[in-house]
């Protein structure tokens, strides 16, 4: 007996399985009817309207109904969906023993102690037939599953079979008066619609139960004479076939098994007995210690039985239904119907290999339990519980599909479990001595090894290793070294599933899944409330497993979820993509197609494959609260926003991710005071003053709103709030606002209107308002309050704000987790001295005078015309900054060149050195040095997407010539070229060839960078651009020695790219004469480039002056603030502070396509901003970003690569190729 579910309750007298759902009804002697979910082990509902014991209960086959009959003489029909009794049928005059629905007609049959059987129409709620004939209690009555028959058992020692075919023939309803007459005759005389067909006599005492065979013309009955009798019937008669003896007390219930040729009976002798219906002998007996059995019920579809006893009920199976199988590569071997079969996953072809020997005993649970397969020898080990545990070894010939001529060679032995451990070796567990016997394919023992723990079962764990299962843990045991390789606490493991690479293992127990690595290092544990049945690993390293009613997944970090709900249990054999191959309980191969997008999505998040995540968001149909909750728990609320439609959920996620814009939109839709309040708190945390103001206005929170205006410097709005408080008669709010404003007159007026004349007098006196104070003193008369003496009076006015603050600058969070970027810092740092800036870093003629002088002259101090300052400075490309002294010219950097001497090396015999260079290397610079320009260009095209090689031609020639030395011999002899190797020495072996010596090195690039920095500082923009481009063109051809230098080269590319972009924009700006707004935009974009601090100060000063001249004061103030944050010199700081003071609180006169609060990059071709979250394409070499329309065109920054081309990346070191 395999117990599936058990309850503890009062005596169970009636049981009924639901035909489709995993439910069972139990009627108790206490009068309660319980409805249980036997899969989950939970009580779903209880019904307790009966008065006294309920002995019969039955589910309807198709409708949401069940019927019950009790000792209160009532039959009740219930609707379990609405949890109520629909109606009650009255008619029986004594206890009702059993009730049952008909499988087709709207009938209920009931048996009662009033010696009658009644058939009811539950739709018309009337009794349609009364079957009389028994002369004692009728203990049970049931319909035939197919024919129009009823069988009944009575304590009058008979079993009767009734013919009810006449009832079915009544297809037309009679008239009402005839119906009433028929009903009267039925009650008095029993009617003629049901007649006795057979009376079966043979029991010596009262018969307690009788039931039909599902398909054969057989009846089985059980009685108080402790016997079970089998009866056969035909069209004319019925007779006794055999008697089964063995029970020691009254037989309570007996039935035929629906799927097996057995009879199940239970008795008051506290036992359940299983009988062979063919041989008519006892097979097995299950006993309880204290509980008598009363009722049996069988599931109409599944192999489940239930038995009710004195203290509850038990749901059980007689035999295991899990097929024995083993997966090997693309094939699964399994046993079905006593045949060994295999199934190919790719072709879905099933082949029957050979029959399996039948067990000699007739007991239950003799089917194969486990199967192990050796692919090299085509050998199969099948283990079962026959004779206390045994195995059979079959060597399957390659061409033996279905033949049995080899069965004489099947080898058998005793053992708890057996498994292959090598190509031609298998291990057998000998439980009695706790050792493993290693046998060969001739079934001969070749080795014995004691086990380190008390082992219940063994499993394969790699060649030469076993996974030994004890009661509370598992260990991996090496049979050769006799060592424990790993141990893990995992109680009651039933199945072990290894991944295809043997790197991970899943240990399945009854209610848990434990994931570990190959050394049994624990990774995660999942606990399930219902039974775990099987599992398999998919190609992504996710474990897919099944429970009784679900297919579920387990990620490497322990996160799990449901993939699909199952109607019946399955056993997974293989997972390929969205296809799950499995075996059902009948041994049939099935293919279940599932949607794996949820766990693939979570796996991509876990492995930080954000590109894959974004692709799935755009293309997949991911939805559901589970995905949203998962993203929220894992810290990705901004991603969860993509899936949410409900506004309240969107609002919560938006607040959590800091996305104020979406939160505002959702709050407008919800329009609830609490949501506006929460929005205000989050907006205040982010410094978004506008949204805080809006939220306070929507909630009419005037006190907070007034204080917000105070701390942000909007004093005019504080005055407006004071007026609103007056209109609302809010004296306290009005007084607070007057305090914020420092308006003493207003405060005196408010206090006087409020009747607080002494306070008004004190306020007026303190602030020197003598006229008002005198008037108030006259009104107060003798009640004038005294003021403290000896204390100097002071004017109590709050400090006036210098400028009104706006929103705090914030990074936008949209898709932020999917965009990575590193801030590059310069390798060659520049001195922090910007006094040498050339005059072309102009402030656009900005002439700022002292503020006090400006006020004295009655102007604003900003009247100088553009181009008026330093016009005499006509230096080409100068910065035009006034009062700036240039430092002395820095020394021209020395050209590093190749420091090593080019020593003549005589060419050795054999392959030319230049050919050896190209065969050994995948570096473009070395191929160019060898003269193999074609392969060098192909390498650069594949690695960096370069298509324009014109700028590289002179560099190729320099590399080739620089890596060779040319020996002039006699005048008539040709010049002899000699390859120059890097690091050559006289002691070097003549057979070892080093790489070519290259004329371009990384230190050279650093020197060129310093020269380009100086040209930039001097304002020689065309010269600086030429030098930066020279560096950018040379980098693909240099070779460095270490990974660290590779990173420095990549860092150098980013630095040069930023300067090239900025200088191109500056030169473009100088070409524009008429478009003033575009000039300001280009100057603003230049400030977004990552520059050295000395250059950033110059760029900010230039942009600040240009915006100020065009009256874009807010933007100019922003640049002034940034300039002050970049440690300017004294003159720059003074100029910036003056601009900040003059622009404070003012707005821009024109709108620019520039938002400094929103992170962006500048398109290298169109010079427009690409804000965070917008689509772009990039250059595969320099990494410059472009709008999508530029894709396929030549990069305007490096002038080499094609924008958007596929490339593998820069390769400039041999260490990248190892």
UniProtKB/Swiss-Prot annotation:
Keyword Membrane applies: yes
Pfam family, one: WD40
SUPFAM superfamilies named in the record: DPP6 N-terminal domain-like, WD40 repeat-like
Positions of WD repeats: 7-48, 49-88, 91-132, 133-172, 202-241, 246-285, 288-326, 363-404
Keyword Phosphoprotein in annotation: no
Ranges annotated as biased composition (Acidic residues): 862-876
Name of the molecule in the record: Coatomer subunit alpha-2
Function of the protein: The coatomer is a cytosolic protein complex that binds to dilysine motifs and reversibly associates with Golgi non-clathrin-coated vesicles, which further mediate biosynthetic protein transport from the ER, via the Golgi up to the trans Golgi network. Coatomer complex is required for budding from Golgi membranes, and is essential for the retrograde Golgi-to-ER transport of dilysine-tagged proteins.
GO biological process: endoplasmic reticulum to Golgi vesicle-mediated transport; intra-Golgi vesicle-mediated transport; intracellular protein transport; retrograde vesicle-mediated transport, Golgi to endoplasmic reticulum
Source organism per UniProt: Oryza sativa subsp. japonica (Rice)
Region of interest: Disordered: 855-876
Membrane-topology annotation of the record: Peripheral membrane protein
Entry's Gene Ontology molecular function annotations: structural molecule activity
InterPro entries, alphabetized: Beta-prop_COPA/B_2nd (IPR006692), Coatomer_alpha_WD-assoc_reg (IPR047312), Coatomer_asu (IPR016391), Coatomer_asu_C (IPR010714), Coatomer_complex_subunit (IPR050844), G-protein_beta_WD-40_rep (IPR020472), TPR_COPA_B (IPR056176), WD40/YVTN_repeat-like_dom_sf (IPR015943)
Quaternary structure annotation from Swiss-Prot or TrEMBL: Oligomeric complex that consists of at least the alpha, beta, beta', gamma, delta, epsilon and zeta subunits.
GO cellular component labels: COPI vesicle coat; Golgi membrane
Domain of life: Eukaryota
Subcellular compartments: Cytoplasm; Golgi apparatus membrane; Cytoplasmic vesicle, COPI-coated vesicle membrane
